[in-house]
Amino acid sequence: MNLALGILEKRGFLKQCTNLEALSVLMDREKMVFYVGVDATSTSLHIGHLIPFMAMAHLQRQGHIPIALVGGGTTKIGDPSGKDVMRKILPKEDIEANVKAIKEQLLRIIDFSHGYIIDNSEWLDNINYIEFLRDIGVYFSVNRMLGFETYKRRLKDGLSFIEFNYQLLQSYDFYMLNKLKNCKLQIGGDDQWGNIVSGVDLVKRKLGTEVFGLTLPLITRSDGKKMGKSEKGAVYLDSKLYSVYDFYQYFRNVPDLDVKKFLYLFTFLEDDEIEHISSFQGYLLNKAKETLAFEITKIVHGESAALKASSAASAAFKGGEGDKSDIPFFKLALTSLEGTILLVDLMVSSKIVSSKSEARRLISSGGVYVDKVRIGDQNYCLNKDSFANGAIELRIGKKKILRIIL
């Protein structure tokens, strides 16, 4: 197998390929131009998007040429893959703002001095519908399209005609990138298999060129929790939507069984180092988790931000001397302390828990600390004297901490 593809396989990135043997031979002969597409449905990517772009980075490190295709055009349609209902159609202005924000995030992850970032609205916005149907639609079989899982599932719940067109547009993207940049490989999540295969087929039938599609596995957690979701919602790459500290802590607190897998997927550490640190047992495995959290935070937010997050976590949970300013905080109104405030009420209002019953249960079980003092009384109250230093630290167990400031 080609060296670059071997790296992807070793690190857990390979799921399906249209013709792995032929792709491997071609990648041994030439520097492959390849692309990953992402629609601009949000102002930020989330960690689920990291998998294809980490694969992109590994291929680029082996000399291959990446294209990040941001879907300013396809977002106006909406991909039905993995969705039970039609996506909300965004205003043009929102899509343009999202495209700009996503491009800025990608520039932190991929070196595009040796690659491209392209917005597919460059060609999709100018399509003549009649010509598109005659030139492109003729190559698509409705019967075949309905055989793909995305459409089969959605037909039961309702599939709009606008969504049904999405596969044609994504296939057209591959066709255009092959014409413009000699792109011969599309990489995407496994839910994109139908769209990718259709693009491969279109390029071959329209241009007579063999191109390839490669999909990546759906990443899961061993504890059954959905990857990329936290108690605070989606784990975004934008620090304004999901703080750098919380991002660091998300990876610091992954299940023990996932540490090795995530080190391979979310870092650029060498195999030997990953095998070594993931072999740690007991409390020593925390060192591997800290390495994982630091490395992926460095990739997404930069080394300086990763160091600050690591320092803040050390100060919060190990009693270190790090800067605590990066620890999440909740600002409490002074009027709330005119008398006293129940700790249970403060826990709910600060959203460190979702309900009073959860707060009481945690207090009763001995899992709640105020300034490192365990609180066992469900009726425990705080007043102005509690905030003599202007803030308190509220901690639940070993993983969740919040500064309450005045």
UniProtKB/Swiss-Prot annotation:
Gene Ontology annotations for the cellular component aspect, listed alphabetically: cytosol
Reaction(s) catalysed (UniProt annotation): tRNA(Tyr) + L-tyrosine + ATP = L-tyrosyl-tRNA(Tyr) + AMP + diphosphate + H(+)
Record keywords, A-Z: Aminoacyl-tRNA synthetase, ATP-binding, Cytoplasm, Ligase, Nucleotide-binding, Protein biosynthesis, RNA-binding
Annotated positions binding L-tyrosine: Y35, Y166, Q170
GO molecular function: ATP binding; RNA binding; tyrosine-tRNA ligase activity
BP terms from Gene Ontology: tyrosyl-tRNA aminoacylation
Binding site for ATP: K229
Keyword Translocase: no
Motif 'KMSKS' region mapped to chain: 226-230
Enzyme Commission numbers on file: 6.1.1.1
Predominant cellular place of this UniProt entry's protein: cytoplasm
Enzyme class, first EC level, given as a word: ligase
Subcellular location: Cytoplasm
Motif 'HIGH' region: where in chain: 40-49
Gene3D superfamilies per the UniProt record, alphabetical: HUPs, RNA-binding S4 domain, Tyrosyl-Transfer RNA Synthetase
Protein family: Belongs to the class-I aminoacyl-tRNA synthetase family. TyrS type 1 subfamily.
Function text: Catalyzes the attachment of tyrosine to tRNA(Tyr) in a two-step reaction: tyrosine is first activated by ATP to form Tyr-AMP and then transferred to the acceptor end of tRNA(Tyr).
Subunit comment: Homodimer.
The name this protein goes by in its record: Tyrosine--tRNA ligase
Annotated source species: Borrelia hermsii (strain HS1 / DAH)
